[in-house]
Curated annotation (Swiss-Prot):
This is Serine hydroxymethyltransferase 3, chloroplastic. Residues 1-60 form a transit peptide. Catalyzes the interconversion of serine and glycine and directs the hydroxymethyl moiety of serine into the metabolic network of H4PteGlu(n)-bound one-carbon units. Keywords: Chloroplast, One-carbon metabolism, Plastid, Pyridoxal phosphate, Transferase, Transit peptide. PANTHER family: SERINE HYDROXYMETHYLTRANSFERASE, SERINE HYDROXYMETHYLTRANSFERASE 3, CHLOROPLASTIC. GO terms for biological process: glycine biosynthetic process from serine; tetrahydrofolate interconversion. It is found in: Plastid, Chloroplast. Belongs to the SHMT family. The lineage of its organism: Eukaryota, Viridiplantae, Streptophyta, Embryophyta, Tracheophyta. Pathway: One-carbon metabolism; tetrahydrofolate interconversion. InterPro entries: PyrdxlP-dep_Trfase, PyrdxlP-dep_Trfase_major, PyrdxlP-dep_Trfase_small, Ser_HO-MeTrfase, Ser_HO-MeTrfase-like, Ser_HO-MeTrfase_PLP_BS, SHMT-like_dom.
Amino acid sequence: MQACCGGNSMASLQQPGRVQGSVFPPIMPPVTKFSQQLKFNISKPFRSSFLKRNLVSEMRASSVSLPNVEISSKEIPFEDYGLGEVDPEVRTIITKEKDRQFRSLELIASENFTSRAVMEAVGSCLTNKYSEGLPGKRYYGGNEYIDQLETLCQNRALAAFRLDSTKWGVNVQPLSGSPANFAVYTAILSPHDRIMGLDLPHGGHLSHGFMTAKRRVSGTSIYFESMPYRLDESTGIVDYDMLEKTATLFRPKLIIAGASAYSRDFDYPRMRKIADSVGAFLMMDMAHISGLVAASVVADPFEYCDIVTTTTHKSLRGPRGGMIFFRKDPINGVDLESAVNNAVFPGLQGGPHNHTIGGLAVCLKHAQSPEFKAYQKRVVSNCRALANRLVELGFKLVSGGSDNHLVLVDLRPMGMDGARVEKILDMASITLNKNSVPGDKSALVPGGIRIGSPAMTTRGLSEKDFVVVADFIKEGVEITMEAKKAAPGSKLQDFNKFVTSPEFPLKERVKSLKERVETFTSRFPIPGV
């Protein structure tokens, strides 16, 4: 199976044999065509049959004895062709995206490359089954194997984070991180209860209650009363003293640790003390760092938190899903197990995505391996190498460095913003994102960029390679600064129009950078595709 593109059948799941075109050579020369990874096998159409052949592919008939019934072609409800025959337009788009991923220097901190095994599970027949409810308590029949799968996934989730199953439970059905967070709010809060999360411009996440002076942006801030805590702008570290003072006055029912652009560990003992002082629940959203937590290369939130949520596709390298871990003992008079499970279903969701749960089970098995721990150590060491080189090159980093998988670069001292840098780097096949930094006034034209190491570490980059990455970024920023000076207008739209016009005077420099980036990146394989 070519999992990313679905070019072949589920053959790799159902019969032995190696799929051609799905494995990279160790080292590849500079490419002009994505020949190795874009080689699709167009097999014959899969003609479904109810009795003599498998519905997924033309496999041998089952060994189970069946009546000798002839079925005419008129009785076959469909012909199961591959994607290339059925929808070449979608196939072409997927091919282009696959090419982009291969050529690009992928530095978005929330992205990663999952494994072929996860891809196979996600692309399996598990997607066909409805299973509202929990294992053993379904609203549909035919779920005996789905029950086995979800129970296995739950057990692996607890094992991956070294949790005692008598003290902790987990729900693996959330569709992603934000739905998981909102399920927690639904479970333990009433409408208009008070919450505190890290402010978005200071590294927090939308789902933690972000709002502006004019608008309640997040659904969390619409249904609950939100008060952010912030960083100490002089250090780039969470201002725990101010958090404690604000919590004492605001009296939140829930305090949320976790972030989307914070490069340091949280002080969980301090946050536990603050939460206890006001009678609040303490929740950790470890979406970005769950893989690092599983590998014990960052601080462990489970010792101090009542609830821990996460996505599954970032540093954990799984499918796009979510999980909610909860203590089994009642907290503040609430049975968290019952409350969380009921909030997920029937409160907010219907049937879970069983194909995702299958992929998650696969990734959680890998998360317990020595190889996974070694990988996470490289994620951190690569990020530190990147951070150190950026500092050498004159960049200002929020908090001065990194303890985890990302760095947040403040471009304002250079008279630059993240939106323009993101644009030029994207033109040069360097993919990262503009990001707010403490003190920013605009989320559309923020003053920073966020850079992450997980995806390119997955592809095999070393600390020395991330030094090269930093040099590429520096060159891109220098081009951006010159382009900003030459642009005819001061607005971002003027800049974007200018740099994409045929008359852009720096296009050859961008082209040169792009060619060198793609030559560099093309040496490293992508797993899973």
